[in-house]
């Protein structure tokens, strides 16, 4: 049996519109998203990061259709804490020595005063695996995850059957990937996401 999962990046926040690094800041959605329409099939379960922008996005997408659909919050899938870079833009940081060093590392080193990239990716994957097992145990056929750009990249980079670069999995706000999970394989310890299709809900 296959479980289909739609991974969706939350709608834009004011910080996203200003191209700021927004990670641990619990921003609400931008006013411009109030009339944004994105159409995704109604899931049996929604797994969301507990941050306001993700929970609000789920409510914006499915609205009144959520009555019979539980939203499960998964703190392990919240966005990375950008430390000293939090709330800043590339323009503000481009002369910052720590930022230059971080860029040269390919974005791998820890953010000064923030979260280690490896730790961040590890917790996202842990959260994903935990929730996939939760869904399989309930024989769910279709679920949606409303999370963050960094979370989607971390999960796809680690678990997708075909190895691709971390940044290859970048998606716009409101877009994401539809993936498949083989229940049998997961039950046998082969924890992979398959058949990725990019979706925008437009």
Give residue ranges: language-model regions.
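Active-site-proximal alpha-helix that buttresses catalytic centers in soluble enzyme cores
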Residues: 3-66
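Beta-strand elements within well-structured catalytic alpha/beta cores of enzymes
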Residues: 4-8, 138-147
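Glycine-rich phosphate-binding loop signature in dinucleotide/nucleotide-binding domains
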Residues: 40-42, 131-141
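Short glycine-rich phosphate-binding loop at a beta-alpha junction
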Residues: 44-50, 72, 142-146
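Phosphate-handling substructures
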Residues: 63-126
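GST superfamily/GST-like fold recognition
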Residues: 149-153
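Domain-level recognition of soluble alpha/beta enzyme cores
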Residues: 160-191
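Acidic, His/Gly-rich catalytic cores of divalent-metal-dependent hydrolytic chemistry
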Residues: 189-202
